[in-house]
Each structure stands twice: as structure tokens, then as C-alpha cells.
Amino acid sequence: MLKPLGGRVALKIEEKGPTVGGFVLAGSAQEKTQTAQVVATGQGVCTLNGDLVAPSVKTGDRVLVEAHAGFDVKDGDEKYIIVGEANILAIIEE
């Protein structure tokens, strides 16, 4: 299993659809974003004074992420993307 480092997050992209959490996305928003599930997070990032800031997302969260963000990776037969937490636009609460 992948374990991202720092402020990175491993995501499993969901099949594209016209809605996110029941909200219909405008055509331009569908092209710029995608829905994904968080499969792993890094430990977070350190501030200038050395404090560790944990990620805002956790394993299992559904998120809205920028469509072209991150790097494609494979772990066995599974495909994932690894993105910086800043590329995650929102947590989808249901």
C-alpha cells in the first residue's frame, strides 16, 4: 500500500458523473474537477517553528480535487493519484 510523505495524499479517482453529493456540477466545473476517495495521507507538514500540522482529510473521505493535479501511480493492479493537500478543493459530506 502507498504511504504518501509530508502534505501529500493518495486518492482513488471515482468514475465521472454529473453530480457530487447530490449537487449537479456545471459543465465547466466537471471538466476542472473530479471526485476521489482518500486512501492514505502523509503525516502532515511542519511549520517554521517545527510544529507538525496534520492533514485536513483522512482515509475514507470523499473529496473534490482539481482534475489535472498530482501524479498517476500504480500499486499492483490499482491506479491512484498522489496530490498535495492544497489541490483538494473540498470534502464531500453526505
Swiss-Prot record:
It holds the Pfam family Cpn10. The keyword Repressor does not apply. SUPFAM superfamilies: GroES-like. Keywords: Chaperone, Cytoplasm. The lineage of its organism: Bacteria, Bacillati, Bacillota, Bacilli, Lactobacillales. Its main location: cytoplasm. This is Co-chaperonin GroES. Belongs to the GroES chaperonin family. Heptamer of 7 subunits arranged in a ring. Interacts with the chaperonin GroEL. GO terms for cellular component: cytoplasm. It comes from the Bacteria. Together with the chaperonin GroEL, plays an essential role in assisting protein folding. The GroEL-GroES system forms a nano-cage that allows encapsulation of the non-native substrate proteins and provides a physical environment optimized to promote and accelerate protein folding. GroES binds to the apical surface of the GroEL ring, thereby capping the opening of the GroEL channel. It comes from Streptococcus pneumoniae (strain CGSP14). PANTHER family: 10 KDA HEAT SHOCK PROTEIN (PTHR10772), CO-CHAPERONIN GROES (PTHR10772:SF58). InterPro entries: Chaperonin_GroES, Chaperonin_GroES_sf, GroES-like_sf. GO terms for biological process: chaperone cofactor-dependent protein refolding. GO terms for molecular function: ATP binding; metal ion binding; protein folding chaperone; protein-folding chaperone binding; unfolded protein binding. HAMAP family: CH10. It is found in: Cytoplasm. CDD domains: cpn10.
